[in-house]
Every structure is written in C-alpha cells, then in structure tokens.
C-alpha cells in the first residue's frame, strides 16, 4: 500500500499549504 503513504503525504502537504494560505489571507484582511 505504498500509494496510501503517498496520498497521506500529499494530503498532509496540501493541508499545511491550505492552512498557510488561509493564514496569509486572514492577515491580509485583518490589515
């Protein structure tokens, strides 16, 4: 189930990227 590990890694990276993007948007709006 190597592809499961790959999907998990991609999902984790996407999640962190999404959180970072949301944080940047929130900072921009708050300013």
Swiss-Prot record:
Organism from which the protein derives: Phyllomedusa tarsius (Brownbelly leaf frog)
Gene Ontology CC, one term: extracellular region
Record-linked InterPro entries: Dermaseptin_dom
Functional summary from the UniProt entry: Antimicrobial peptide, active against the Gram-positive bacterium S.aureus, and the Gram-negative bacteria E.coli and P.aeruginosa. Has hemolytic activity at 286 uM.
Record protein name field: Dermaseptin-TA1
Protein family membership: Belongs to the frog skin active peptide (FSAP) family. Dermaseptin subfamily.
Pfam hit, one: DD_K
Residues with Glutamine amide modification: 31
Keywords in alphabetical order: Amidation, Amphibian defense peptide, Antibiotic, Antimicrobial, Cytolysis, Hemolysis, Secreted
């Amino acid at each position: 189930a190597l592809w499961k590990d790959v999907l998990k890694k991609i999902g984790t990276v996407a999640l962190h990227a999404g959180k970072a993007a949301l944080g940047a948007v929130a900072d921009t709006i708050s300013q």
